[in-house]
Amino acid sequence: MKLALSLFLLSGSLAQYSNPGACSGDCWGHDPGFYQRVSDGRYYRFSTGGGIQIHASDNLEGPWEAVGEALPGGSVVDHAGSTNLWAPDIHYEASTNLYYMYYSVSTLGSRDSVIGVATSPNLQPNWTDHGALFRSQAGGNYNAIDANWASIGGSPILTFGSYWNGIHQLPLAGPLSLADGATPTQIAYNSSGNHAIEAGFVFYRRGWYYLTFSSGRAGSYDTNPPATGEEYRIVVCRSASGTGDFVDKSGRSCLTDNGGTTILASHGNVYGPGGQGVFEDRTRGWVLYYHYANPDIGLSTGQYQFGWNVLQWADGWPSV
């Protein structure tokens, strides 16, 4: 398998994707959340596993160090997955001077899932857990994991979803509660295969709301590798409203036509990039961050690497 993967990655290098930016120190990462602290610009990244693993550095390139867990011992949510939390998403509210972390509580292959929320004044370990914000049911059409907060048209919106009926949005009343009568609205879907689309992330730039998401299979690369090209890749769509009508660069709907323009896929020593987000760095501009597997290091989730690239822009579309 390793020889076949190496040949595939070599051929994929012709796609002209840039290699990840430099990373030193502890560069492990999985489904990273990311924030540059408001007070001093220090970088923090948060990863799937246990009570959410936290790494910190004064520089984006590192050296990165593990500093602890956001919720040691897990979440207060009553669920089988409460001690192995997934997919953290971080944002800051100036009105409360607090950082908010949305996290996922679930088990593989299940729609019995919960999005929880926790707060911190400084991004350091030992956050205050506020428990469940939203829950999906085992027989439902959507999966309450992979949450992302965004201000859309001045209102707080939670984007979430994985597989099944794809990516959805929910209006919030505030960072700790849903809006009255809130129901999920579907914004992106992949009708093919097992509907492998997840990790939606919305950001705003110059009149457009951009939706990035991960398409393809996320893991088991070491024990049950997917067919060539079916591993994770990062795609993008955009919308003027931010709450629907997302299309890709060719104009295909990302809800009804399986749209999505690939901005990063396997190449070189980068395999299965995904679990992504975007932030505006104080000096570099817009930066895409994600995890990936480096075959020279290993393909298991415990060997995933943190990756980042400065986004380039042409005609209102990002690339790396």
Curated annotation (Swiss-Prot):
It is found in: Secreted. Belongs to the glycosyl hydrolase 43 family. InterPro entries: GH43_arabinanases, Glyco_hydro_43, Glyco_hydro_43_endo_a_Ara-ase, Glyco_hydro_beta-prop_sf. Residues 1-15 form the signal peptide. PANTHER family: ARABINAN ENDO-1,5-ALPHA-L-ARABINOSIDASE, ARABINAN ENDO-1,5-ALPHA-L-ARABINOSIDASE C. The record marks D146 as: Important for catalytic activity, responsible for pKa modulation of the active site Glu and correct orientation of both the proton donor and substrate. Its EC number is 3.2.1.99. Glycans are attached at N126, N190. The active site is at D31, E198. It catalyses: Endohydrolysis of (1->5)-alpha-arabinofuranosidic linkages in (1->5)-arabinans. Endo-1,5-alpha-L-arabinanase involved in degradation of pectin. Its preferred substrate is linear 1,5-alpha-L-arabinan. One of its GO terms (cellular component) is extracellular region. Coiled coil: none annotated. Keywords: Carbohydrate metabolism, Glycoprotein, Glycosidase, Hydrolase, Polysaccharide degradation, Secreted, Signal, Xylan degradation. It comes from the Eukaryota. It comes from Emericella nidulans (strain FGSC A4 / ATCC 38163 / CBS 112.46 / NRRL 194 / M139) (Aspergillus nidulans). GO terms for molecular function: arabinan endo-1,5-alpha-L-arabinosidase activity. GO terms for biological process: arabinan catabolic process; pectin catabolic process; xylan catabolic process. This is Arabinan endo-1,5-alpha-L-arabinosidase C.
